[in-house]
């Protein structure tokens, strides 16, 4: 059994929206397995769904540079959102993404090395840590991007179609954050888990029903799950009457890939105890 740490309880709480004690009990029951705890909570009806894994707590900005055939996305992190709004930080981010695109970089390491002197100068000036965290470059027949408030960035690669179509699909990805491009990419394990949760959640409803009826109910739920999880099956946000895959096909395109960046995704930022912080400040003031 895995140790039930405060960090684990916090992650479950963030992913489910449930109370601290309920999350602790669910983890204890699941032997410290957070995914099993979520499944158990869903099966009991305590929650309908859970957010994707990843503690999102760091600040900073996403930046994108593209020319319709290629795009570079980078994430630069700061300790506070205040710094992320300042010109010094914005200028560093802009210079970094410009260099990444001009040099056709495909990995963050060379960009980090190239920008280290500028980063150190910025840190010395603002008194706050700044880091280039990640970089992705994509290329294709058609590349469209979408940036939402410098916090979410998306690049979509199409075979055929045009940049406007790619941008529309990128905007949809930013709004819906699909896990997969195609239903076929959803793992058998994920499908089986969804099936098990559905059967537990609807145990009373399906009791006594013929096997073929239950099978159709399960198929319906799995179909809905695949539609929610895969981009091509999702209803297009600007026109829910058409699926994203159909939109692409109508525009003479095939979606090759999508890349989604969100500031701080997967980074846990330490949360100080407020009472302890105040006490520490008072103690420091007395010295």
UniProtKB/Swiss-Prot annotation:
<dbReference type="GO" id="GO:0003746">
    <property type="term" value="F:translation elongation factor activity"/>
</dbReference>
<dbReference type="InterPro" id="IPR036402">
    <property type="entry name" value="EF-Ts_dimer_sf"/>
</dbReference>
<dbReference type="InterPro" id="IPR018101">
    <property type="entry name" value="Transl_elong_Ts_CS"/>
</dbReference>
<dbReference type="InterPro" id="IPR009060">
    <property type="entry name" value="UBA-like_sf"/>
</dbReference>
<feature type="region of interest" description="Involved in Mg(2+) ion dislocation from EF-Tu">
    <location>
        <begin position="80"/>
        <end position="83"/>
    </location>
</feature>
<dbReference type="GO" id="GO:0005737">
    <property type="term" value="C:cytoplasm"/>
</dbReference>
<comment type="similarity">
    <text>Belongs to the EF-Ts family.</text>
</comment>
<keyword id="KW-0963">Cytoplasm</keyword>
<dbReference type="InterPro" id="IPR001816">
    <property type="entry name" value="Transl_elong_EFTs/EF1B"/>
</dbReference>
<comment type="function">
    <text>Associates with the EF-Tu.GDP complex and induces the exchange of GDP to GTP. It remains bound to the aminoacyl-tRNA.EF-Tu.GTP complex up to the GTP hydrolysis stage on the ribosome.</text>
</comment>
<protein>
    <recommendedName>
        <fullName>Elongation factor Ts</fullName>
    </recommendedName>
</protein>
<keyword id="KW-0251">Elongation factor</keyword>
<dbReference type="InterPro" id="IPR014039">
    <property type="entry name" value="Transl_elong_EFTs/EF1B_dimer"/>
</dbReference>
<keyword id="KW-0648">Protein biosynthesis</keyword>
<dbReference type="Pfam" id="PF00889">
    <property type="entry name" value="EF_TS"/>
</dbReference>
């Amino acid at each position: 059994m895995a140790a039930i740490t405060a960090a684990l309880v916090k992650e479950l709480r963030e992913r489910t929206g449930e109370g601290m004690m309920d999350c602790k009990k669910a983890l204890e029951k699941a032997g410290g397995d957070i995914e099993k705890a979520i499944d158990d909570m869903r099966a009991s009806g305590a929650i309908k769904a859970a957010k994707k894994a990843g503690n999102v707590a760091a600040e900073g900005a996403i930046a994108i540079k593209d020319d319709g055939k290629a795009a570079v996305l980078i994430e630069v992190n700061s300790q506070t959102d205040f710094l992320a709004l300042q010109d010094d930080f914005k200028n560093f981010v802009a210079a970094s993404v410009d260099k990444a695109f001009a040099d056709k970089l495909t990995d963050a390491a060379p960009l980090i090395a190239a920008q280290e002197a500028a980063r150190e100068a910025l840190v010395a000036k603002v008194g706050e840590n700044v880091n280039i965290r990640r970089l992705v470059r994509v290329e294709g027949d058609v590349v469209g991007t979408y940036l939402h408030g410098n916090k979410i960035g998306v690049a979509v690669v199409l075979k055929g179609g045009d940049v406007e179509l790619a941008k529309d699909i990128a905007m949809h990805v930013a709004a819906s954050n699909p896990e997969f491009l195609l239903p076929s990419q959803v793992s058998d394990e994920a499908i089986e888990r969804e099936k098990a949760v559905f059967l537990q959640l609807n145990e009373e409803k399906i009791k006594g029903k013929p096997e073929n009826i239950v099978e159709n109910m399960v198929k319906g739920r799995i179909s809905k799950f695949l539609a929610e999880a895969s981009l091509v099956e999702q209803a297009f946000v600007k026109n829910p009457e058409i699926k994203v895959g159909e939109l692409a096909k109508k525009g003479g395109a095939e979606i090759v890939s999508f890349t989604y960046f969100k500031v701080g995704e997967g980074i846990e930022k330490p949360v100080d105890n407020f009472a302890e912080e105040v006490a520490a400040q008072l103690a420091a003031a007395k010295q």
